[in-house]
From Swiss-Prot:
Keywords: Amidation, Amphibian defense peptide, Antimicrobial, Secreted. This is Peptide PGLa-R2. Expressed by the skin glands. It comes from Xenopus ruwenzoriensis. Signal peptide: none annotated.
Length: 21
């Protein structure tokens, strides 16, 4: 549902942020 979708988006953002560091 909405929660899992938000979690997936947050995970993608976290991965991108880690790569940017």
């Amino acid at each position: 549902g909405m929660a899992s979708k938000a979690g997936a988006i947050a995970g993608k953002i976290a991965k991108v942020a880690l790569k940017a560091l």
